[in-house]
Amino acid sequence: MGKGGNSEDAVSGKEHGEENMAAWLLGIKTLKIQPYILPSLGPYDVKVRIKAVGICGSDVHHFKTMRCANFIVKKPMVIGHECAGIIEEVGSEVKNLVAGDRVALEPGISCNRCSLCRNGQYNLCREMKFFGSPPTNGSLANQVVHPSNLCFKLPDNVSLEEGAMCEPLSVGIHACRRANVGPETNVLIMGSGPIGLVTMLAARAFGAPRIVLVDVDDQRLAIAKDLGADDIIRVSTNIQDLDEEVAKIQSTMVTGVDVSFDCVGFNKTMSTALNATRAGGKVCLVGLAQSEMTVPLTPAAAREVDIVGIFRYRNTWPLCLEFLRSGKIDVKPLITHRFTFSQKDVEEAFETSARGGNAIKVMFNL
């Protein structure tokens, strides 16, 4: 496998006479567009001119705190990982792509040697090098170098912005696969932020007949309803309201909750999911807001409610692109804000995403 876009120590330079620029995270809420030296092109690599980059919640965490979960930014790092672009150059052994192809990039490079990789669980590889996850540089840049097998050609009717949206959509698709969502699966989703919404879109594409979204924010719930939620339920942040809210969820679902997705990851959201899910059902933990939670596991175990988790995704890009090509999923309404790749716009875009509000997906057009 090639090196990919991981020139971790390079901060300045030119690439074939053209300055390659990137958005470097230098400190808390400090981003600066600076030169970025690309690694040399390996035989199985491609050079991609990046055209669309979305801002993810993990990018915002890095921007605001210089860390996300256990990943800590200790030195300047190029930010970003949701991306698509146009092939500019291919390595000597690349056969499936040519210059000019439009591609969506899967951002994680696994080792392909460990037992997890050999078992097909490459997303859990301990040697993973993931765009914009320290210490690996990201994709908010004019150009990146990336392994060709992680670049997926876009169908003619799928835009570069939609290609960049394959990354968050992959989270929803992987979650639905882990939970075995199908045409007879009634789905509850805790949280109507970006990940809750893509999980809803994925569940519908997998055939879920009824989907209910729960949130504390009326504005987000209204967006979920517009995007196709069968019902929406506003809840409080007060744990004392849990039993009443679970009863409301169950009456709204009518036939029972087969699968619950917690796309938030708080004590209350996970407790709600566990209590609302029918006996023999499944709860999938997607959001990881809290590292530790106190939740009612014993009653859930007594009802044989299975609990599964996800970490990122694996083998999802081809299905993402097919759902987008066929129209089974439309991610365009999720893109609420667009910015150019200028110093001013980079700063404003991250502040916009950090504020939340009516911003769902903030997208750069390079």
Swiss-Prot record:
PROSITE patterns referenced in this protein's UniProt entry, alphabetically: ADH_ZINC
Keywords assigned by UniProt, alphabetized: Metal-binding, NAD, Oxidoreductase, Zinc
Enzyme class, broadest EC rank: oxidoreductase
Pathway the protein acts in: Carbohydrate acid metabolism; L-idonate degradation
UniProt name for this protein: L-idonate 5-dehydrogenase
Source species of the chain: Vitis vinifera (Grape)
Chain positions recorded as Zn(2+) 2 binding sites: C111, C114, C117, C125
SMART domains assigned: PKS_ER
Family per similarity comment: Belongs to the zinc-containing alcohol dehydrogenase family.
GO MF entries: L-idonate 5-dehydrogenase (NAD+) activity; zinc ion binding
Binding positions (Zn(2+) 1): C56, H81, E167
Listed PANTHER family: L-IDONATE 5-DEHYDROGENASE, SORBITOL DEHYDROGENASE
Cofactors: Zn(2+)
Lineage top rank: taxon: Eukaryota
InterPro entries (alphabetical): ADH-like_C, ADH-like_N, ADH_Zn_CS, GroES-like_sf, NAD(P)-bd_dom_sf, PKS_ER, SDH-like
EC number(s) recorded for this UniProt protein: 1.1.1.366
GO biological process: L-idonate catabolic process
The reaction(s) this protein catalyses: L-idonate + NAD(+) = 5-dehydro-D-gluconate + NADH + H(+)
